[in-house]
Amino acid sequence: MTHRQNFASLSSGTDYEQLANRFRPIFERIAEGAIKRERTRTLPHEPIEWLKKAGFGAVRVPVESGGAGASLPQLVQLLIELAAADSNVPQALRGHFAFVEDRLNAQPGPQRDIWFKRFVAGETFGNAWTEVGEVKIGDVITQVSPKDGRWALNGHKYYSTGSIFADWIDVYARRADNGADVIAAVHTAQPGVTLHDDWDGFGQRTTGSGTSIFTDAVVEADDVFDFSTRFKYQTAFYQLVHLATLAGIARAAERDVAQQVAGRKRIFSTGNAPLA
């Protein structure tokens, strides 16, 4: 059996309505505070915690490993519903679901099982790939170096979407010993990781897309992955999450406009009724 066939047998789908009904009450709670969070730029720590505790981050994990076994189309449907409640939240979780997808594509074995257990336990990922400053296009300055049987990670990243909410960060780096590009899975609860809420962009106001600083951050030996093994459809996956978010925004806009129009008393511009 090939690796691709192994993957095809994982998380092929479940009953969508039953799955979605697990999370819809949480989506409703998230929607209640979405406008206020956007206006006051309040990061959605609590809504993301609700989702983590409910197992939302493990919906793609196979049922036999404790997850929901959702297919990729079903994940997209859930993200659309979530985006209709608060579009910042699925964007903040985009890096998490990408890392889950990568582990789904990994070779079966104990290491993959460890990650599945972490996802089921509610642990989530942010991402830190982008660098600013003197870095050249296509290059990376952040490095991992062998140290005492582990790795030491050093570098600065920007646009670290979701990392401020996460237990782990998916960091794009380069090995100092041989120059190979790698992905380092870095635990955030350590002195060597500093996360700043300094995102000042026009959009994504509450996605936690600020600066991540790594200063001799400890990375376990098994948590550095050669970039050549990254799941091959990752670019399409990232764009798919964006499209799901946009679809949710459109759904919310349709809902809100319909509510406004339905509540109007004056329906014709030259009507003789008082203005509503």
Task: Indicate residue ranges for each PLM-predicted region.
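Buried hydrophobic positions in well-ordered alpha/beta secondary-structure cores of metabolic enzymes
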Residues: 78, 153-155, 184, 214, ...
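Glycine-rich phosphate/pyrophosphate-binding beta-alpha loops
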Residues: 158-163, 238-242
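A generic structural signal for well-ordered coil/turn residues at beta-strand boundaries
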Residues: 123, 138-140, 165-167, 180, ...
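Glycine-rich beta->alpha junctions and the first turn(s) of the following alpha-helix
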Residues: 201-276
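A short core secondary-structure module
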Residues: 159-194
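Alpha-helical interface subdomain recognition
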Residues: 2-60, 68-77, 244-276
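Fold-independent oxyanion-binding glycine-rich loops
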Residues: 129-131, 155-156, 174, 186-189, ...
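Glycine-rich flavin
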Residues: 45-53, 58-156, 161
